[in-house]
Amino acid sequence: MQLLIDAGNTRIKWALTDINHVVGEWHAMGNVVHADLGKVKQAWSALKIERVLISNVAGDAVAWQLRKILVELNVPDASLTWFRAQAECAGVRNAYAQPTQLGSDRFASLIGARHRYVGQRLLVVTCGTATTIDALEADGTFIGGMILPGLATMATSLAVNTALLPSVDKADRARVFADNTHDAIISGCLSAQVGAIMYAYEQRTDPHARCVLSGGAAQYLGPYLPMPFDAVDNLVLLGLDASVRGDAY
């Protein structure tokens, strides 16, 4: 059994999978915020972990904590792999000027989207602490993308003071022309996010291009998008799982 870990900027997500089963078929899964990372030890202690694959964009401190927990669970270093972007993996060709500079989470998301929608032109949008918008060609070539502050990050940066700290969980009730500062911040941030996604989608110049939406803020942005899209949960974990299978699909 293989433990897949997506260590993001805000949360740590994980899933247990069997490489002999269908990609994305989880035997167990969960997620915690960084402050609660120690709690995964109890959950993982009940699992039969033979190998571990980690995508980490959360920094060295989180990497150290993860390794410490795995050592305490008697998982040998030889069984641990840190997933990183490369020139090519699992049907995705990375056209970044320096392929290894692409974030491991973005690369895994592209692999996950490619696996789910093989042979289709895609716009892969992940909505978390940052919003990333990446273009994937039908042949699996990642041609590039854009990064902007995520919905909550953008809203927080515009807060006038703590009393007006915007709550993005009310984004589904936002009006374009708000009659108060709190809602005006939410409206502006939503418009910026949706506008970036729409602009990127228009640049694909293909009516058959598919928009794939993932991440915690996807539920708030989706209702405002004018184009069809598919919401896919845990795209990074799906990509990590697919990467283990190589080019088999």
Over which residues does each language-model region extend?
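Short glycine-rich phosphate-binding loop at a beta-alpha junction
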Residues: 48-58, 79-83, 207-216
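Phosphate/pyrophosphate-binding loops at sites that engage ATP/ADP/AMP, CoA/4′-phosphopantetheine
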Residues: 36-51, 73-74, 197-210
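Short glycine-aspartate micro-motif
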Residues: 2-6, 53, 122-126, 212
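Short glycine-rich, Thr/Ser-proximal phosphate-binding strand/loop in the N-terminal lobe
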Residues: 2-48, 140-167, 171-172
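Adenine-nucleotide phosphate-binding core of ATP-dependent small-molecule kinases
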Residues: 173-210, 217-220, 228-229
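Glycine-rich phosphate-binding/hydrolytic loop that grips phosphoryl groups
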Residues: 229-249
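Nucleotide and nucleotide-moiety/phosphate-recognizing core
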Residues: 42, 64-65, 71, 76-80, ...
